[in-house]
Amino acid sequence: MAEAARDKGFEYLVISDHSKTAVYADGLPVDRVKEQWAEIDALNKDLAPFRIYKSIESDILSDGSLDYDDDILEGFDLVIASVHSNLNMDEEKATERLLTAIRNPHTTILGHPTGRLLLSRAGYPIDHKRIIDACAESNVVIELNANPYRLDIDWKWIPYAMEKGVQVSINPDAHSTGGIDDIQYGVLAARKGGLTASACWNANTMVL
């Protein structure tokens, strides 16, 4: 993945596997997290100046907490917090669940905020304004997931995010080297919403 991203002209790659709760997706228990960190450290020496960032897509549990202890979460370069389970929620429950995760000091990015899958799942209802406002207050980035079956956050909310000063990260959600190119769909959706380069968190060299 790192070599494929480098060959496409990218300066860095964020490795963000599923977390330990996502056993259906081979999520990483703590011992495998630490093994991966060691592998990334070694690869960063070999691939410099290309950089691999240590990340995790940490599950937002039903109470809004993340599924690793603080001492593990603080070891990542960035943490993407996402909902993957118990999706049948009303707007108040879903919104409060996300708000709790946003306020977690380890959360860097709120991943695919509604959990929708286009053409197959509508996603849970959320109060987008409250979510975006909370991201502004906590300096949390919102993901625009570029998988063509997600495109979540919806482009219609990009102007409000920009108005509130919330950065948007266009992420390809790549599970293989071929998935890296899905970032193009996110770029198209972002342009439809009027996202500027300065408001796109990963449009420039990342400094963490």
Q: Model-derived features: where do they sit?
A:
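Charged catalytic cores and adjacent phosphate/nucleic-acid-binding surfaces used
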Residues: 1-51, 62-208
